[in-house]
């Protein structure tokens, strides 16, 4: 299973798209937000027939203020309408902001460190605890020892015990192996992880994890199809 990750950087968007909205609205948050809306809507349309889910990085939209929030809500609704499972990567301590309110995503990433309070969600919603993040300074805290395991693994155990799925940003198979060993029944959302390094996350039937690919957001439909084929080939080797 492969998810489209939308975490767009303004300077990587098609310059023609950016220029069109800048000409229309003038430079500023509105032009950038509308460029992100167009970019996201086109990709969701391409991905919907091929992929099961989309992950939207909240901060990339909220940089545009209230217009960015409107775009985020609009893209979530658009993706759901086209049959995609929607996850907002917010790393929040208040999941209901993204699973209820005006956004109504199917799932949301949360920070695990406030404790089990962040695992509370409606029955039809999912919470993904961001136990391993990919920012450069993450190991300063997440790799500290807590008893016989690193802190992020201790957090993973606790979050899984309270019913949360787990999110990890890692390109290392050892991290995935350790995470799966500590939380054998948890569903894993793996970002920035290729299919080969993610193999330990899957069971013998190719289930138990979802990979998120942020390179597809700058690719065309052919690239999405190629990524799906490659992952299917890897997983069926199990």
Regions found by a protein language model. Give the residues of each.
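A C-terminal functional module that forms or caps the active site or interfaces directly
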Residues: 171-215, 219
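Conserved N-terminal beta1-alpha1 strand-loop-helix module at the mouth
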Residues: 1-71, 80-81
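C-terminal functional extensions of proteins
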Residues: 207-238
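N-terminal active-site wall of soluble small-molecule enzyme domains
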Residues: 47-104, 173-178
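Conserved anion-binding
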Residues: 9-10, 14, 20-22, 27, ...
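Structural preference for beta-strand elements that scaffold enzyme active sites
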Residues: 1-5, 52-55, 85-87, 107-109, ...
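Short, acidic/polar
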Residues: 32-47, 95-101, 152, 198-199
